[in-house]
């Protein structure tokens, strides 16, 4: 069973809320407490980013969080530890978000087996070439990990067809060109792309990049989108000096965004 797609399927009259946080930012204890809080406040899926020094798809907020996490010693092994601590205590499935090079360095099969053993349910690799997905899909399927593939707003119809055909489950639709980060508005072209994906496939769609407010979500819910990813807005909330302030801030944000996802 594709747990991530099933989580999206379970919201026929609403839109799944998918917070993203960077593992180890600003420290591992905060990450663990944040995961518990997001779970308790209604997050439907959680993306947990593995810090990386060359995160080309990420904007300044998430790049900064990765730098701090790396300086604090958070690498793959520490992320596996976080998963081991929290996964059996959460109702919310976790998607791991690394870049491709660290996976290759560790070994694709070893990496997938490790994240599966520690409780992850999904994998998103922002810089994974479509031409190199076949091996990863097989290994993920063998280990009950759902690989989520990207569709960019610049993707041709032919490429969207190929991605939709290859995708084992849901698709991550990027809302705009460029990097992650808070934006004032979401391009209506997203609606055209989501409608096209639904026309040529039965895949569920999560939308990310630039989504940060309840108003964004209410607009997006009319566009054939099954889930919304909110990253930079959550990561910013974790920059407070006191851990209690960090957790209360992401709790409030999660509540307000969750409320917006319900029709």
From Swiss-Prot:
Record-listed E.C. numbers: 4.2.1.20
Gene Ontology MF, one: tryptophan synthase activity
Gene3D superfamilies, alphabetized: Aldolase class I
Pathway connected to this protein: Amino-acid biosynthesis; L-tryptophan biosynthesis; L-tryptophan from chorismate: step 5/5
Highest taxon of source: Eukaryota
Annotated keywords: Amino-acid biosynthesis, Aromatic amino acid biosynthesis, Chloroplast, Lyase, Plastid, Tryptophan biosynthesis
UniProt cross-references to InterPro entries, sorted A to Z: Aldolase_TIM, RibuloseP-bd_barrel, Trp_synthase_alpha_AS, Trp_synthase_suA
Catalysed conversion reaction: (1S,2R)-1-C-(indol-3-yl)glycerol 3-phosphate + L-serine = D-glyceraldehyde 3-phosphate + L-tryptophan + H2O
Pfam families, per the entry: Trp_syntA
Record-annotated active site: 47, 58
Compartment annotation: Plastid, Chloroplast
Root EC class: lyase
SUPFAM superfamilies on file: Ribulose-phoshate binding barrel
Assembly and interaction partners: Tetramer of two alpha and two beta chains.
NCBIfam families recorded: trpA
Family affiliation: Belongs to the TrpA family.
Biological role: The alpha subunit is responsible for the aldol cleavage of indoleglycerol phosphate to indole and glyceraldehyde 3-phosphate.
UniProt-recorded name of the protein: Tryptophan synthase alpha chain
Record lineage: Eukaryota, Rhodophyta, Florideophyceae, Rhodymeniophycidae, Ceramiales
């Amino acid at each position: 069973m594709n747990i991530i797609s099933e989580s999206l399927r379970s919201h026929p009259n609403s839109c799944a809320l998918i917070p993203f946080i960077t593992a180890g930012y600003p420290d591992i204890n905060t990450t663990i407490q944040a995961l518990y809080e997001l779970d308790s406040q209604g997050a439907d899926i959680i993306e947990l980013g593995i810090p990386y020094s060359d995160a080309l798809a990420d904007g300044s907020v998430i790049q900064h969080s990765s730098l701090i996490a790396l300086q604090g010693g958070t690498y793959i092994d520490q992320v596996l530890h976080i998963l081991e601590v929290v996964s059996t205590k959460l109702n919310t499935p976790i998607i791991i978000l690394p870049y491709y090079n660290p996976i290759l360095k560790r070994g694709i099969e070893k990496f997938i087996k490790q994240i599966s053993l520690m409780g992850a349910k999904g994998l998103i690799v922002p810089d994974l070439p479509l031409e190199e997905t076949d091996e990863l899909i097989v290994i993920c399927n063998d280990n009950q990990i759902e690989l989520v593939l990207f569709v960019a707003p610049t993707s041709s119809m032919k490429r969207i067809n190929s991605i939709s055909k290859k995708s084992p489950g849901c698709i991550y639709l990027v809302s705009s060109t460029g990097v992650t980060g808070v934006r004032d508005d979401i391009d209506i072209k997203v609606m055209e792309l989501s409608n096209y994906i639904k026309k040529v496939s039965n895949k569920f769609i999560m939308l990310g990049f630039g989504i940060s407010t309840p108003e964004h979500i209410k607009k997006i819910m009319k566009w054939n989108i099954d889930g919304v990813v909110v990253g930079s807005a959550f990561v910013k909330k974790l920059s407070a000096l006191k851990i209690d302030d960090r957790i209360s801030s992401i709790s409030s944000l999660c509540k307000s965004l969750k409320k917006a996802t319900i029709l």
